[in-house]
Amino acid sequence: MSAVRVLLLPGWLDSGPGHWQTLWEQQHGWERLVQADWVWPRRGDWMARLDEALLGPPPTGADERPVLLVAHSLGCHLVAAWAAHSCHTDRVRAALLVAPPDTERDDVPPQLSGWRPMVRSRLPFRSHVIYSDGDPYGAADVARALAAGWGSSVESAGPCGHINAESGLGSWPHGLRRLAQLGRA
């Protein structure tokens, strides 16, 4: 996928050592968007950071390749909120959105209250949502409704928890195949 720039967007608290996003970063040399505050994520700050990452050169120098966003959990809501407000969405070819949580549930931690309401606007680029049946942070019907609002294709990964390190997916070959399909289309 050298014809595209892959930008990994972790969710709340970042993606740890065994997470598929971390493994992809290590195995493929892809970039991780590092946020200033992983514990108390402020939507506006995270959106500004994404704009900075897309407008500025990546760590390896100038790069005009189209971008594939790979978001997990709260990172999915970052993509939706950013796309609804940024004038730089033309830099993105597509987005893989994995395990979007329901930030409007009553039991959401107070650190995530700034992510209400969830942005449901149509995304201006291709996107694909992968959700899990039995995700403790978001019901399948909510993930499907978000995908419909975003104009995303959607699929279930089956019963995989939050599709994170605890799900035991390793480098998650299925996700890589979906990302490759998005990058080619």
Model-derived segments and spans:
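Active-site catalytic motif of lipid deacylating hydrolases and related acyltransferases
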Residues: 2-65
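Catalytic histidine-centered segment of alpha/beta-hydrolase-like enzymes
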Residues: 41-44, 160-171
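Catalytic histidine neighborhood in serine/cysteine hydrolases
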Residues: 29-32, 148-164
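Conserved alpha/beta-hydrolase "acid-adjacent" motif
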Residues: 16, 136-142
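Conserved alpha/beta-hydrolase fold motif
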Residues: 68-70, 95
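Gly/Ala-rich beta-loop-alpha elbow adjacent to hydrolase catalytic centers
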Residues: 70-80
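Active-site nucleophile loop of the alpha/beta-hydrolase fold
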Residues: 11, 34-38, 95-105
